[in-house]
Amino acid sequence: MYSNKIVKIKIFPDTFNILVLFDNGITKNIDFKKKLDEEFYRDLNNKLLFQQARIDEGGYGLSWNDDIDISEFELWNIGENTDDII
């Protein structure tokens, strides 16, 4: 199964949102506020850490450090389509 790869991101630390542009040209808004309640992502409540999100090599996900990451597949599924331009 093909999964769309991440091409570009724009981080909004004040609202815990990330715009993600995928290789098929679709941009999705990822609202991380719900994810921050999960123990795995709890450290991302720190805005300084949240804004350090980086695209993994090959566009297969986002990482913040060696311990916190999320796959492109999950981002695609939880994101909402948007016309916002990155």
Name the predicted role of every residue range:
Residues M1-I86:
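Motif-centric detector for short Cys/His coordination patterns
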